[in-house]
Structure formats: structure tokens, C-alpha cells
A protein has these predicted regions:
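TRNA-recognition modules of translation machinery and tRNA-sensing kinases, especially anticodon-binding
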Residues: 1-437
Length: 437
């Protein structure tokens, strides 16, 4: 097969047989986000590379190994977004959205890009639902952002997930933690990978996020960040847990969670499952109080999360959660002959204006082929129009499920009457086809 007819390695097509699942999930997410007061934001798929270097962190795997970076003809370095938080923060800062009042609540559906080995439920192009909250330092804000994620899983019927919670402190108390980490890992310098050796001086906490099996094993006995929290961070974390307890959102404390991005401070969390193997983190996020300031703005306490759509869908399938099929065709109107086809085309247009689904022949099929097609697309009713039907102003209406046929008037009054009764038929499921006359 020619390369031009093959999708790029690490990317997937979402075909009509699956896209309806995405649409339904996205609709639920939009609805719940709106209930929490969040509004949609859309940002470019590429940004200045420096945005991610400063925001995500130049010692992270994401920036060092995984970004798609290129130079424009003018020599400007740009990168495809590897995550959504940095671009959303840049947009809020650039457009001074905070002038509209705080807090600012945004959500987005982003395609993101990371150059990494393709694995099950891990792709080079992947999709995220993200929610970001700016201008709130209260532990209640942490609980609200976590509550939104938990509510989404609830609405979708996903149950086999564990909320894991940690605090990685603020820059002040984390400085002491970094010293402890550095001292610990220096005892294993001969075993650390080259990347982690470079991190030892710049940001030893990133070693905890290393994917190397050797480094991961060493990190198991590393100092725990919770032991180094300052009083303010301890109190903040305690209050976050109190809010979650009050809302009856179950969680466990996992002191090993540090997240793979440098902008995080204080609360970090993940929703994980054992059903997806090594790619078990379906949603992750936390607080990033210094990000807006790092990008040149004023100090703006912020937090958010990203939820992987591919992993969510894989988990729903693994759990056997059935996503309802999209509505099928309500009526197929077949036309035989040029005049009848024009009449069918006109009637279909009128039917569609009632917000129901209607189709007619647009490829020149025979009547038999049209009926076969109507059955294939799951049409609930069909109607056949030919020369005789036009002359007599009558047509045959067929219930495709029962096979019952009824002769009905072929005029605008029929169309109105039909869809009035048909709407009742859809709701009750008991209407008799004769009621349409």
C-alpha cells in the first residue's frame, strides 16, 4: 500500500462506526462542565516552543524527548502542543481574560502530540478533555476540579477507577525535599540512566518520573515529599481531603505521585485503573500556582486536569459499558422516475426541517436497491413515490419493522400529520400505523 494511503504511525482514524461514541461522551462532558460553570476555550495546535520549555519544564521527558518541534521559514521555533494547560494559560494571559473577574473556568477538547513509542492506548496523536481553573487558591477549588472529573466518570458509568492523591508542596518546602532527593540519588549515580544523571543537579524530582526500570526501582525507596511539606502546604492538603470527605469522593494517598510536568505545585492527583495495564492513568492533574507568573503574568493560583479520551473509551469498552447507537433514519422516501425523484427530494427536505432524519436516492438505484439500502441504514419507515402515486396524490407508507403497509395521501398535510403522529410513535413505541392517516 502506498504511504499516501496509510495513516501516519502513532495516529488513528475515528470512523463513523466509532465517532458517535466520541460525540456522545463529548456532549456529556460539555453538559457537566457547564453545570460547574466552565466555558469552552480553543487554542492553536502549535505554540512557540519556549512556552512549553518554560511551562512544562525543560528537564521533563515531554520537552527533552517527546515534542514535535520545527522552525518556520522565518526561523521561529514552534512545537505541536504536547498537553493543553500551557496553551490555555497563554491564551488567558495574552487576552487578559482575568479582567472579566475571577475565578476563570475553562474547558477544552484538544488533540495533543508526543513523539513516543506506540503502545496500547498510547499514541503520538491523542485527545484530551481538559478543565482549567484560574484565580482560586482555596482548597475548595482543588476539591471542585477533582469533583468535576469524578462526576464525569460517574455520568459515563465508569466505576473501576481509583482516585490517588498527593501534595508535592510549594517551591519553599520543595527546596528541602530536593536536597533530600539529591542526597539519596547520589548514592546510586553509577546506576542512574544518563538522563537522570543530568536531572540530579537541575531537578532531582524528575527522577521519580523516569520510565527506566532501573531508575524506577531505585526511586521506590526515595524520600517521600509529604514528609517535607511546610505548615501551609500541610494545612492546604488536609483541607482538600476534608472537602473530598464531605463530598463523599473516595481517594487514597499515594506519596509517589509527582506528575511528569514541572508546573505542578501542592495538590496533584490521578484517576487510575488496573484494567489498562501500564497505561492505567486515565485522568491526571493538580495545582500549578506559578505557571501564569512563569509566563510573565501576575501571580495567579490555578489548577486543572487532563483526561485521555482514548484511554477513557478503552476503559469503557473493557468494562462492557454500552454506548447507545446514534438515531437511525426515520423515513426513506424512494422515487421512481425523474418527477418522482424530485418530489421525493422535496419531501425529504421538508421532513428534515422537522429535525427528523430522512433520506432519498441520490445515486440512481433501482426500487429494489433503494429498499435494500433503506433496510441497511435502519430506516423506521419507507415511502415509495412513482408516476401513479404522483397522479393519484397517494403513496405507500411502510413500517420497516413490521412490514405493514398503508396507503396515505401524498401532500403537505400528510407530512405534517405523519410526523406529528410519528413523534408520538417514537415516544410511546405503541402507536398504530393506521393512526397516521
Amino acid at each position: 500500500m502506498s504511504l499516501i494511503t496509510k495513516r501516519v504511525y502513532g495516529a488513528e482514524d475515528v470512523l463513523p462506526k466509532d465517532s458517535y461514541k466520541w460525540q456522545l461522551i463529548e456532549d456529556i462532558m460539555r453538559s457537566e462542565a457547564a453545570a460547574y460553570g466552565f466555558k469552552e476555550i480553543r487554542t492553536p495546535v502549535f505554540e512557540h516552543t519556549e512556552l512549553f520549555q518554560r511551562g512544562v519544564g525543560d528537564t521533563t521527558d515531554v520537552v527533552q524527548k517527546e515534542m514535535y518541534t520545527f522552525n518556520t521559514k522565518g526561523g521561529t521555533s514552534l512545537s505541536l502542543r504536547p498537553e493543553g494547560t500551557s496553551g490555555a494559560a497563554r491564551a488567558v494571559l495574552e487576552h487578559a481574560v482575568y479582567n472579566d473577574g475571577l475565578p476563570i473556568k475553562t474547558y477544552y477538547f484538544d488533540s495533543c502530540y508526543r513523539y513516543e513509542k506506540k503502545q496500547a492506548n498510547r499514541y503520538r496523536e491523542f485527545h484530551q478533555f481538559g478543565a482549567e481553573l484560574y484565580g482560586a487558591s482555596s482548597p475548595a477549588a482543588d476539591a471542585e476540579i477533582i469533583s468535576l472529573a469524578a462526576t464525569l466518570f460517574d455520568r459515563l458509568g465508569v466505576t473501576d477507577l481509583q482516585l490517588e492523591l498527593n501534595s508535592i508542596g510549594c517551591p519553599a518546602c520543595r527546596a528541602e525535599y530536593h536536597k533530600a532527593l539529591k542526597k539519596y540519588f547520589e548514592g546510586y549515580k553509577d546506576k542512574l540512566c544518563d538522563t537522570c544523571l543530568s536531572r540530579l543537579e537541575k531537578n532531582p524530582m524528575r527522577i521519580l518520573d523516569c520510565k527506566s526500570s532501573v531508575c524506577s526501582e531505585i526511586a521506590k525507596d526515595a524520600p517521600v515529599v509529604l514528609d517535607y511539606l511546610c505548615d501551609d502546604c500541610k494545612n492546604h492538603f488536609q483541607q482538600v481531603r476534608a472537602y473530598l470527605d464531605a463530598a463523599e469522593i473516595p481517594y487514597i494517598i499515594n506519596p509517589k505521585i509527582v506528575r511528569g510536568l514541572d508546573y505542578y505545585t501542592k495538590t496533584v492527583f490521578e484517576f487510575v485503573t488496573a484494567r489498562l495495564g501500564s497505561q492505567g492513568t486515565v485522568c491526571g492533574g493538580g495545582r500549578y500556582d506559578g505557571l501564569i507568573e512563569e509566563l510573565g503574568g501576575q501571580h495567579t493560583p490555578s489548577l486543572g486536569f487532563g483526561l485521555g479520551m482514548e484511554r477513557l473509551l478503552a476503559l469503557m469498552e473493557e468494562q462492557g459499558i454500552e454506548i447507545p447507537l446514534p438515531p437511525s433514519c426515520d423515513i426513506y422516501i424512494a422515487g421512481l422516475g425523474e418527477e418522482a425523484q424530485k418530489k421525493a427530494f422535496t419531501l425529504v427536505k421538508e421532513v428534515r426541517e422537522t429535525s427528523l432524519i430522512a433520506e432519498c436516492d441520490i445515486v440512481g438505484r433501482s426500487l429494489r436497491a433503494q429498499m435494500k439500502y433503506a433496510d441497511k441504514i435502519g430506516a423506521k419507515f419507507s415511502m415509495v413515490i412513482g408516476e401513479n402515486e404522483i397522479n393519484e396524490n397517494k403513496a405507500i407508507l411502510k413500517n420497516m419493522e413490521t412490514g405493514e403497509k398503508t396507503e396515505v395521501p401524498l401532500d403537505e398535510q400528510f407530512i405534517n400529520a405523519f410526523f406529528h403522529h410519528y413523534t408520538e410513535y417514537q415516544i410511546s413505541g405503541t402507536a398504530n400505523i393506521e393512526d397516521i392517516q
